[in-house]
Amino acid sequence: MAAKPGAATPTYSPKIVGRSRLPIFKDSDLDWSRPDGRGFHQCRPALLQTGAVSSASGSAYAEFGNTKVIVSVFGPRESKKAMVYSDVGRLNCNVSYTNFASPTLGQGTDHKEYSSMLHKALEGVIMMETFPKTTVDVFALVLESGGSDLSVLISCASLALADAGIMMYDLITAVSVSCIGKSLMIDPVTEEEGCEDGSFMMTCMPSRYEITQLTITGEWTTPNINEAMQLCLDASSKLGEIMRDCLKQSASASDE
């Protein structure tokens, strides 16, 4: 796990104090109290664990507040489908929700849009040429939907791939921001997503400080986008450190 027993669960909130430029939007801009009591620029604690599924090549469990997901990775293995020879491997991603994950989403069915977005987020970071003619399957399951589900899934999937020994250019982290009125709220929960005017999700390789994907919905001003990007970059850097600590602790435990 990323946190030792008895220790406080780490958070990846972006650093606001000490920045050269103050945030454009402040908590006082809107008479809004976050359901879980956090500040607008405060992320939920991130609990991470690898090796959650013993039968998988690699796996990870992530718990960000009430959002709980588990990701299993199988492979590289020979594809069951006949495929033309390729110098690079093949990546399959599947996202599903348990029946009890959410009153509205918990249908136990696959979510094709999330599966596609997870695939896009991961394919750019995996060294596909290291497993030609074979397939890596990523199965992501949302145990409990508590908000920012996709960003948690992407970060957890990256951790599971690392646990499986899949070669990557870097870990990949994902962070979401909701725009409600004039205020930006990082790592939104379900209630906040339900009344947001716009959503923003960024995936990046934290060690390289390189953005790999942006997903923006709703109406955003240029200052809004710039502020959201900085918040996500700061949070991604901290989340990357938490993920690397989790992998180090897992490796140390395996050596004992």
Curated annotation (Swiss-Prot):
Major localization class: cytoplasm
Phenotype of null mutants: Extremely slow growth, especially during the early stage of development.
Localization (cell): Cytoplasm; Nucleus
Superkingdom of the organism of origin: Eukaryota
Tissue: Highly expressed in imbibed seeds and young seedlings.
Matching Pfam families: RNase_PH, RNase_PH_C
Biological process, per Gene Ontology: rRNA processing; seed germination; seedling development
Function statement: Non-catalytic component of the RNA exosome complex which has 3'->5' exoribonuclease activity and participates in a multitude of cellular RNA processing, maturation and degradation events. In vitro, is a processive phosphorolytic exonuclease and requires a single-stranded poly(A) tail on the substrate RNA for its activity. Plays an important role in seed germination and early seedling growth by mediating specific cytoplasmic mRNA decay of transcripts coding for the abscisic acid (ABA) biosynthetic enzymes NCED5 and NCED6, and the ABA signaling transcription factors ABI3 and ABI4.
Similarity-based family: Belongs to the RNase PH family.
Subunit structure, interactors included: Probable component of the RNA exosome complex.
PANTHER family tied to this protein: EXOSOME COMPLEX COMPONENT, EXOSOME COMPLEX COMPONENT MTR3
The protein's name in its UniProt record: Exosome complex component RRP41-like
Gene designation per UniProt: RRP41L
